[in-house]
């Protein structure tokens, strides 16, 4: 496609090229269903190690702009991060029993959160779950999470009333999910859409949707997480605008989710 576009551009007059160039080089993006992409809020290529925020956070969820993560191997519950093969590489500590996490602080409301990821083919070394996740937080805790593993993906809401006694954080509502057949070492694109009280999560052509009042709260950060070992690149965040086709898309997604349960 790129070679074809280049040959076509060489044959065009400069004046015509000026008007057609935006269309010839238009970026191909994964489809959205709940929303339409609006203003771009953040673009993080993640090909070099991001600078760490100097802000003092309010817990883990808010009070900072930019990135928070650890680069120290076996540093505890947050795991460790570096750049490997041109991507942001997260490693769960074998003794931590907790995903590696990296948070990007920015204020947002309705949004499209998109990131490429790869589950790396490394030994488990006692770690249990090969997975990645994308979470959205409000001022104090998680609002929603998109979990992805080799055999399935699910979308989770968090309770506004119940607290998990083990971690003192909001308890999870029952997840909604679909089976997947992902491969180690392959790159995929995860898309999490949030608008009002609804959310849609999509990977490898399969989507899930759910709703919860907490989704409508102002958001303060995006968290990336890794079970075992995974890499990320090209984190993009846009405003999530209303999609007039959402009722039709919702019906199709719910039907596919129902069919997947059979």
Please describe what each predicted stretch is.
Residues 46, 192, 235-237:
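Extracellular beta-strand elements of beta-rich domains used
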Residues 165-189:
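Short, aromatic/His-centered strand-loop micro-motif at the edge of beta-sheets
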Residues 56-88, 94-97, 253:
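Extracellular glycan-recognition surfaces and repeat-rich motifs
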Residues 202-223:
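Short, solvent-exposed beta-strand-to-loop segments that form ligand-recognition rims
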Residues 29-38, 217-262:
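Ligand-recognition surfaces built from glycine- and aromatic
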Residues 99-106, 176-182, 211-212, 221-222:
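Beta-strand-rich interaction surfaces with strong enrichment in secreted/lumenal proteins
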Residues 90-164:
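Secretory/extracellular carbohydrate-interaction modules
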Residues 113-115, 185-195, 199-203:
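Short tryptophan-centered beta-strand motifs in secreted/extracellular beta-sheet-rich domains
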């Amino acid at each position: 496609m790129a070679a074809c576009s280049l040959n076509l551009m060489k044959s065009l007059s400069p004046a015509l090229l000026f008007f057609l160039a935006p269309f010839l080089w238009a970026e191909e993006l994964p489809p959205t269903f709940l929303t339409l992409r609006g203003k771009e809020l953040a673009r993080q290529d993640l090909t070099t190690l991001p600078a760490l925020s100097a802000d003092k956070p309010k817990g883990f969820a808010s009070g900072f702009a930019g990135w928070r993560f650890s680069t120290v191997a076996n540093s505890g519950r947050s795991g460790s991060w570096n750049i490997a093969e041109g991507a942001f590489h997260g490693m769960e500590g074998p003794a931590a029993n907790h995903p590696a996490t990296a948070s990007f602080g920015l204020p947002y409301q309705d949004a499209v959160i998109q990131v490429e990821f790869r589950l790396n083919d490394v030994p488990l070394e006692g770690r249990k779950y090969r997975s990645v996740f994308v979470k959205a937080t409000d001022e104090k805790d998680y609002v929603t999470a998109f979990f992805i593993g080799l055999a399935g993906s699910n979308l989770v809401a968090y309770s506004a009333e119940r607290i998990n006694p083990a971690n003192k954080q909001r308890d999870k509502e029952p997840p909604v999910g679909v089976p997947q057949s992902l491969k180690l070492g392959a790159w995929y694109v995860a898309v999490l859409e949030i608008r009002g009280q609804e959310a849609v999560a999509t990977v490898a052509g399969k989507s899930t949707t759910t709703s919860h009042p907490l989704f409508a709260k102002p958001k303060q950060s995006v968290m990336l997480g890794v079970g075992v070992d995974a890499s990320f690149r090209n984190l993009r965040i846009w405003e999530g605008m209303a999609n007039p086709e959402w009722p039709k898309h919702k019906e199709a997604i719910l039907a596919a989710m129902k069919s997947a349960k059979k």
